[in-house]
Amino acid sequence: MASVRQFPTIKAVRSFIIDGVGSGGDYHNVKGGHWLIDTDISTPCSIWEQYKKSRTSWGINVLGSFLVEIEASDGTVGFATGFGGPPACWLVHKHFERFLIGADPRNTNLLFEQMYRASMFYGRKGLPTAIISVIDLALWDLLGKLRNEPVYKLIGGAARERLDFYCTGPEPAAAKAMGFWGAKVPLPYCPADGHVGMKKNVEFLRKHRESVGPDFPLMVDCYMSLNVPYTIELAKKCLDLDINWWEECLSPDDTDGFEQIKRAHPQLKFTTGEHEYSRYGFRKLIEGRNLDIIQPDVMWLGGMTELLKVAAMAAAYDIPVVPHASGSYSYHFVISQPNTPFQEYLANSADGKSVLPVFGDLFLDEPIPTKGFLTTADLDKPGFGLTINPTARAKLISSDYLLNPAPAVGLKAEVEPEVATRPSGEDVKPTEAIPEETKPSEGASLVDSITNGVKTMAAA
């Protein structure tokens, strides 16, 4: 009897800060003037006048993007991107790497549980879970490459041959012209804007309904910015506009509020989930049966491993799963699952009127729905089918310099300091002072401040 061949194990984990805007997994780290950050969009911070104008004013892009590479013992490399910037790199190596080195990359359930449970005392939601997500996606990319198969074939195969998209952006008429089956538009005003804001919201949605006609599905993204009474009133005032669904009307923590708005408008569809994390967070949303669609983000909730568990729960209640954005990572999931009827495309061009890669210039061959759809043929490459753009790779900043910085001398040393070494073997020379170029400028984001510093150290 032939023995089972030895499968490669995990040899190394590397992480990189992605320098610059418009590249990588942080959707909101884009140039000024982009519709995602600099148009009227109601947000949880819209209750304060100084944070209405731009979403960057309250820090939506503060973390930036990062990339994780996982190398197997045979030299095969899987990778994935997400949001988290320098703090993400720190946790990858200072905490999660211990569970990965020497492990069998096929043990995705085990590795997820170890990372999730080990970070439970400070995690469960938010950044720690988003970091686990990127590690998990890099593992799936590695597995696909080791087996020479696309990820969708590893998680059940194709449930359909064609993947249809709706488009989220500022101009539903443009989405219709580009071939998308429907469009979702962000709501501009919140309850703090009072009666005038309510009236403007209705007028805004009426304008877009008229621009696309009565038969084109129109959805509304409220981005966690409303409350129960406001949602009920707004939905009532828009009944004649035939809104296909109302998305993320309430705070992610107000799960009971969805019961109230569904009771008030049982004939309407309400959705949420992009800011929920792990199967535990989704359990109550699903069991309540107050949501018509759930919308997890595979780059945030725990990766492909956890998304499959959430989808299985939702399938038992016949609740469709329509992931939030996430490019190719979502596409492989959606095309493999029977209860995932379509996918979101988040318009990445500055004006939202053209189709560009979700991850900017990071990848050479990111599939994009140029006519509102993709097919399995577009996804038939090993792993997630992505290749890092050499130009973008040249701008990646290794976290070696973040994790092993050259010390700045604040007090005069009594003895000659020892020369440390980086993992690469290069000497780390003690510095006499913090160079001016490493000091954060006023208003700089966290990623800008740290990347400026590590660039200087890398050049030293």
Residue ranges and their predicted role:
Residues L127-A130, D136-P170:
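Glycine-rich, aromatic-flanked loop segments that form ligand/cofactor-binding clefts
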Residues G156-I261, H265:
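Metal-dependent enolase-superfamily TIM-barrel catalytic cores that perform enediolate-based chemistry
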Residues I10, G75, F96, I135, ...:
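Conserved, mostly hydrophobic/aromatic
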Residues F66-A72, P367-P369:
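Short beta-strand elements
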